[in-house]
Amino acid sequence: MCIRDRYFLERLAEEYGLAIEYHPKPLGATDWNGSGMHANFSNTTLRTCGSKETYEAICEAFRPVVNDHIAVYGAYNDQRLTGDHETQSITEFSYGVSDRGASIRIPIITVENGYKGWLEDRRPASNGDPYKIAGRIIKTVKSAKV
């Protein structure tokens, strides 16, 4: 959800006397997935490379900077990223094809298209700042040795 969407949602809620809750686990430690703001991203390389090795190199670029990402991915994300409910643990990093429990998911359609497509970072929380999240992802992707 972009900033503009949040603005409209807030104004609509205001008009009806409601409030929006962006907490990633608004019901506390319940047995449900919580609320994330998964970030789908690509660049020219991801859309055209056709190389599993390139995708793996980009994913591996995230491994040493996990804490830098978590720092901007939203408050209380530790309550959502438990390793349960289709999430990886906040202290772990993984990636995989169509793996909804990974930190970064490589969509199956990307693989079916010959490794031409995008990646999905499943760690950002619903209350994260999309600009900070995008900035951190861009910095990491640009640092990848491909």
Protein language model annotation of sequence segments:
Residues 126-146:
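An acidic, glycine-/histidine-flanked metal-binding catalytic module
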Residues 12, 61, 65, 137-144:
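Conserved short hydrophobic interaction patches
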Residues 14-127:
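Loop-rich catalytic cores of soluble enzymes, especially ATP-dependent carboxylate-amine ligases
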Residues 1-3:
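Short, small-residue-biased leader/transition segments that mark boundaries at the very start
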Residues 5-8, 12, 58:
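Short, hydrophobic/aromatic alpha-helical segments in well-folded domains
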